Amino acid sequence: YPENSFAEIAQFCRWRYISLSEYVELNEGPGIWDFLAEVWQTMKQAVADGLAAEGTLPGGLNVERKAKRLYAQSKENERPQVRELRIVCAYAFAVSEQNADNGTIVTAPTCGSAGVLPAVLLYMQRTHNIPDAQVLRALAVAGLFGALVKRNGSISGAECGCQAEIGTACSMAAAALCALMGLSIEETEYAAEIAMEHHLGLTCDPICGLVQIPCIERNAVAAKRAMDAFNLSGLLCGSRNISFDMVVRTMKETGLHISAKYRETSEGGLAKLYDRRAAN
């Protein structure tokens, strides 16, 4: 995109009286909607495939697929907040388990963080009967924020730790929720900033180098955190002090100072201390 920061994009949108999704269309052309329709269909299929699958994931860690069981584990008189948690997390598990089993997923922004965005969007669509066309607008906004992080920060766990992957996914999902539910540009920025800020410093230490532990569960937690960021942004936007651009720069600087042991090498953290014999 011609603008280099979110501040520049927001200023341009205000000047032209357009939304963030309209900004994306202005730069990408109308063909972007056909592309995003394919993206959305692939995301929904990944959730469906993951919810239908059972068994153990490949790789030797004996990680059981949990999405199907989680999705079906409703209880009588289940509280609404528990149901939301269960369904959103089941969707995130489904996509992440498909990724771990060489299934077809959409990088958002990476394979290891692919479960966050489809989980929150599909839950909101089904809960509020939102048409696909509106979801595509939200996907456009998610992609815009992901592109900004890629340009000014990093989306690579090998470069900046898991904050760069799951933190970006959480920001994209929070921004998408704002677009989906009609929040302002300022509220959208704030949600994306909250989502990234509270992943700062997160390490990438996959056990045995597999995108399973802690990666799959982390997608579910980040999906819920994106929903929290979305809700908070609508309540507190007027009193914020940190911009999205600032938190992205902070993430990049933080990531470059994280030891290489905690940047996808599996030489530190959980990957180092995990004892497969004790776990089994």
Where are the model-predicted features located?
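Generic surface-pattern signal
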Residues: 14, 25, 48, 52, ...
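Amphipathic, positively biased hydrophobic alpha-helical segments used for protein targeting
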Residues: 122-126, 153, 157, 168, ...
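Functionally critical mobile loop/hinge segments
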Residues: 175-280
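Contiguous, well-ordered alpha-helical segments that form the cores/surfaces of helical PPI scaffolds
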Residues: 90-94, 115-125, 140-148, 163-179, ...
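Conserved active-site and cofactor/substrate-binding residues in soluble primary-metabolism enzymes
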Residues: 4, 34-42, 83-90, 100, ...
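Accessory "access/gating" subregions that flank catalytic or transport cores
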Residues: 30-161, 269-280
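Generic structural "secondary-structure junction" signal
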Residues: 107-108, 151, 157-160, 164, ...
